[in-house]
């Protein structure tokens, strides 16, 4: 029988392909997004030093919302707020191999509305 391809393995391959083309610096870090079934996570990463500068997720107490898309918008606003506290205004968006749709899009648009440029 033909087995169905594992969607997560395909996403990881796509993510590695994109990661070969983008990287973050201290002045313009990479905004990395990871989406699980229940939560969404965002990190600002300096790839030169290999350091996480700021992070936010739906597990943070500041994030609230009924739907997962509303929660993703809250994470986007929170990561933008934490970036502004560290004087970071420009980032490189890394969608993590996910389609720019739904929760990933909501996070990105909320981050843009709250002052991040990408």
From Swiss-Prot:
<comment type="similarity">
    <text>Belongs to the universal ribosomal protein uL18 family.</text>
</comment>
<dbReference type="InterPro" id="IPR005484">
    <property type="entry name" value="Ribosomal_uL18_bac/euk"/>
</dbReference>
<keyword id="KW-0689">Ribosomal protein</keyword>
<keyword id="KW-0687">Ribonucleoprotein</keyword>
<keyword id="KW-0699">rRNA-binding</keyword>
<dbReference type="GO" id="GO:0022625">
    <property type="term" value="C:cytosolic large ribosomal subunit"/>
</dbReference>
<comment type="subunit">
    <text>Part of the 50S ribosomal subunit; part of the 5S rRNA/L5/L18/L25 subcomplex. Contacts the 5S and 23S rRNAs.</text>
</comment>
<keyword id="KW-0694">RNA-binding</keyword>
<dbReference type="Pfam" id="PF00861">
    <property type="entry name" value="Ribosomal_L18p"/>
</dbReference>
<dbReference type="InterPro" id="IPR004389">
    <property type="entry name" value="Ribosomal_uL18_bac-type"/>
</dbReference>
<protein>
    <recommendedName>
        <fullName>Large ribosomal subunit protein uL18</fullName>
    </recommendedName>
</protein>
<comment type="function">
    <text>This is one of the proteins that bind and probably mediate the attachment of the 5S RNA into the large ribosomal subunit, where it forms part of the central protuberance.</text>
</comment>
<dbReference type="GO" id="GO:0003735">
    <property type="term" value="F:structural constituent of ribosome"/>
</dbReference>
<dbReference type="GO" id="GO:0006412">
    <property type="term" value="P:translation"/>
</dbReference>
<dbReference type="GO" id="GO:0008097">
    <property type="term" value="F:5S rRNA binding"/>
</dbReference>
